[in-house]
Amino acid sequence: MKQNVIALVFGGRSSEHSVALRSAATIHAALMALGHRVHCVGIDREGNWRYQGEPCQFPGAVDRSAPLISIRPGHRSLSYTTQESGTVEIGIDLLFPALHGRWGEDGTIQGLAAMCGLPCVGSGVLGSAMAMDKDVTKRMVQSAGLVVVPWLAMNSMRPWEELVECLGSSTLFVKPATSGSSIGVSRVSNALEYAAAFAIAAREDTKVLVEAAVCGREIECGVLELEEGLMASVVGEIIKKEGHAYYDYQAKYDSNSVTGLRVPSLLPPDIVARIQALSVQAFRCLELKGYARVDFFLTEEGEIILNEINTLPGFTSASMYPKMFECSGYPPPKLVGALVEYGLSSASKERL
């Protein structure tokens, strides 16, 4: 593979800042193994872009004393200024966002890259924005014939009794419309719990979703876009053990979590094939690019229900997406290499 100059952008203002740092460390190691030049750009929690070096040691936090980054529209470059070196301009072939949540996964960074003429790994503005909003995602894929979890979207609280009647369940999930990593998500079964959960979710977003609880297995499938077409990974399953009612933040990222991942799943081949086909269908429905992880519930009756779609899935050591593709013949360096290749080739077709 040709050596490219890649700006790896990580951190960000969202509540998933710490997860993004861990994803970036994995991606950085893969890019270095492939022989690319990697310039690291950390976005601190206040939204400042800071140059972290080439390469980066990933100390666990964005260095807030590092120089600020400037981007000029129309120039495929980043620049920063120090007293010792003056202004340093770095030509960039590709932007690789390792960002999760708002101001990174929602189309904002993708729009900035497009305005500046910088090729960018992953989905564009439209697909990123639609997939980030769980309400919009559900409406889009439901219109395409996929089954989704029953839900209501709201900007202010509605009566508990009304929600139970509308959703047909007395156990509900309350979540922000645009957060990830299960941040701000609560499982509730009465009006008091609902009021507290709504307040938590509303701290993350002005739009809050309330969903009916689904009794079923939690299944995930990855999609990777290659020059020859879309590839669905093996299917993985989240194994919830005693102590976790659902796959929350602790279960996802705590090394002592009692929740496990089974990759590949032990599902029958026909069910796996259906999940893979639905993953590709959802990917196309939202006009996504590059890669995504699609999450489902599988009920005892065999119904496959789409839960949500992540356009910048986690790349941590505990993340399902890289595990599923490693079992599909794409270990992290090969997987990241495929993302780089497609990001560059799709940009050339779009004449960025």
UniProtKB/Swiss-Prot annotation:
Database matches in SUPFAM superfamilies: Glutathione synthetase ATP-binding domain-like (SSF56059), PreATP-grasp domain (SSF52440)
Keyword Metal-binding: yes
Main location, first listed in the record: cytoplasm
Gene name as annotated: ddlA
GO biological process: cell wall organization; peptidoglycan biosynthetic process; regulation of cell shape
Source organism, top-level taxon: Bacteria
Pfam families: Dala_Dala_lig_C, Dala_Dala_lig_N
Ranges in a coiled coil: none
One of the record's GO molecular function terms: ATP binding
UniProt catalytic activity: 2 D-alanine + ATP = D-alanyl-D-alanine + ADP + phosphate + H(+)
Protein name per the record: D-alanine--D-alanine ligase A
Domain ATP-grasp: start-end pairs: 138-341
Cellular localisation: Cytoplasm
